[in-house]
């Protein structure tokens, strides 16, 4: 983000470094990065839940991923992180600690604009749990491990899941 005239003057130089898109006034580039990270965090959660659902229902999660990856739900997240999850490969590409930092920044930015982002808030809480449990250096697809641990607990005020989401501790 920044002044449109300056952007136009420097666009060719910027193109030498990668894809260039003008997104608006100063600060808009940072918001675009946060928007990207919100999609990444939430989508890793969605991929995790989809694979857990497939497995719980008796379907082959690898086959389910293969079946849907070229459809409407297909995405780089399903391709890359779905594969990591299925291979149980949580060596860091993007660390849980970094995803948590981004989720905190997303929530702080939303608060500054007086908006509520419920999915981002829940994902932030889940990453807080992961980091508090000492798994901050794992790849952010390790969100799957926590969601899988929580899969048998319905979300109500007496459930373990509810307690975890509000007290941030689990065993």
Regions found by a protein language model. Give the residues of each.
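Helical "substrate-binding/catalytic lid" subdomain
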Residues: 28-150
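Long, positively charged, glycine-interspersed low-complexity recognition regions
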Residues: 158-160
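Intrinsic-disorder-associated, low-complexity terminal segments enriched in Asp/Asn/His/Tyr and depleted
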Residues: 166-167, 171
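Rossmann-fold dinucleotide-binding core
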Residues: 1-41
């Amino acid at each position: 983000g920044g002044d449109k005239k300056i952007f136009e003057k420097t666009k060719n130089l910027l193109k030498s470094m990668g894809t260039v898109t003008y997104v608006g006034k100063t600060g808009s580039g940072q918001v675009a990065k946060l928007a990207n990270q919100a999609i990444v965090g939430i989508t890793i959660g969605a991929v995790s839940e989809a694979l857990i659902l497939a497995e719980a229902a008796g379907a082959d999660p690898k086959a389910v991923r293969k079946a849907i990856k070229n459809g409407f739900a297909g995405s780089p997240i399903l391709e890359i992180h779905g594969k990591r999850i299925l291979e149980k490969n949580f060596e860091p590409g993007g660390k849980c600690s970094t995803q948590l930092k981004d989720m905190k920044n997303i929530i702080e930015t939303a608060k500054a604009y007086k908006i509520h982002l419920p999915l981002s808030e829940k994902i932030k809480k889940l990453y807080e749990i992961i980091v508090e449990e000492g798994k901050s250096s794992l790849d952010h697809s390790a969100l799957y491990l926590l969601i899988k641990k929580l899969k048998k607990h319905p979300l109500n005020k007496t459930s373990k899941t509810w307690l975890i989401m509000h007290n941030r501790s689990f065993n």
